[in-house]
């Protein structure tokens, strides 16, 4: 029997530069099939370029919460008029209508089979693009495994470093984060499964170098810094080793928001984010100035 190599690529978040290197690495490793498990766009402003690469590589593509997020804003399930959503509006407006229609039609999970091995692939979970599956929710993972008519449950979403384990003889795999990994500066994560004769023979957790300075320059050239520097700086903190500063920013923003208004979510939200995090514009600007020492733009 011939061994089939399947690449699982998750959480690109618009980082076309990282994706380009991942696809080169996959080709060098003789990958036969590609599965993209969501969060293709939205965070870095290279959505069209990212989606064109994805579409030309595979038809096995899922939506993540970031795609659902754009769809639901489009459907006016949230009010996105405050400052923290300016970059999201910019990235949505930059997408071609063809690519908007493409993400609208993406499924949130897939059941696939290679050489007799059944895979269930989702972004968050088989239930929702937003549901978290990680080590803290072991009971939930075990519940899905017990209900699973498949040999493997594969997902992303949490931006954990790549990991896998076997539960009741079934593979549970987090494919990591290809575009905005908080664990490795200038490295993209993805996974190659080698499948043969009804078995997963090998699980290769891949780390691929990409040029973070190219990402920085491409952000500058995109024009998004004229929209809202704060969020783009926070996003970049997440990939250049300053993730702690990013976490502290949002932790402090929540504290200040609660002190001043008593709530930190958007009332009346109708989408997947029932309690949508929302910070007043003055808090966003104030903390943006406070955290400038961590920013590169």
How would you name each of these model-derived features?
Residues 4-13, 118-125, 172-176, 204-205:
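Active-site-proximal beta-strand elements of phosphoester/diester hydrolases
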Residues 4-102:
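Core catalytic region of metal-dependent phosphoesterases/phosphodiesterases
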Residues 10-12, 38-40, 65-68, 124, ...:
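Active-site metal-binding loops of divalent metal-dependent hydrolases
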Residues 26-31, 114, 146-149, 192:
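Glycine-rich phosphate-binding loop signature in dinucleotide/nucleotide-binding domains
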Residues 103-141, 145-148:
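Internal, conserved structured core segments that host functional sites
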Residues 124, 130-134, 164-167, 184-187:
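A short secondary-structure junction signal
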Residues 140-152, 156-166, 170-178, 188-190:
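Anionic-ligand binding region
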Residues 167-175, 179-297:
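Acidic, His/Gly-rich catalytic cores of divalent-metal-dependent hydrolytic chemistry
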């Amino acid at each position: 029997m011939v061994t089939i190599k399947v690449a699982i690529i998750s959480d690109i978040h618009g980082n076309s530069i990282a994706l380009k290197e991942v696809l080169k690495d996959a080709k060098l490793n003789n990958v036969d099939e590609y599965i993209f498990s969501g969060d293709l766009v939205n965070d870095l402003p290279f959505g069209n370029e990212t989606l064109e690469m994805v579409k030309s590589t595979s038809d096995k593509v899922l939506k993540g919460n970031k795609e659902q997020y754009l769809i639901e804003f489009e459907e006016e399930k949230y009010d996105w008029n405050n400052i923290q959503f300016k970059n999201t509006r910019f990235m949505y407006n930059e997408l071609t209508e063809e690519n908007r229609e493409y993400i609208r039609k993406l499924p949130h999970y897939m059941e696939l089979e290679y050489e007799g091995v059944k895979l269930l692939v989702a972004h968050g979970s088989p239930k929702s693009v937003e549901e978290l599956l990680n080590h803290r929710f072991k009971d939930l993972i075990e519940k899905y495994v017990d209900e699973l008519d498949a040999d493997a449950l594969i997902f992303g979403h949490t931006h954990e470093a790549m990991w896998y384990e076997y539960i009741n003889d079934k593979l549970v795999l987090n494919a990591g984060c290809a575009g905005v990994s908080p664990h490795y500066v200038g490295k993209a994560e993805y996974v190659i499964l080698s499948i043969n004769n009804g078995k997963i023979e090998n699980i290769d957790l891949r780390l691929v170098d990409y040029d973070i300075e190219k990402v920085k320059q491409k952000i500058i050239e995109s024009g998004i810094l004229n929209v809202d520097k704060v969020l783009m700086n926070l996003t970049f903190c997440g990939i250049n080793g300053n993730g702690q500063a990013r976490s502290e920013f949002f932790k402090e923003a929540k504290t200040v928001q609660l002190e001043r208004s008593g709530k930190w979510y958007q009332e009346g939200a109708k989408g997947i984010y029932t309690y949508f995090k929302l910070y007043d514009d003055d808090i966003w600007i104030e903390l943006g100035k406070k955290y400038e020492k961590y920013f590169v733009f």
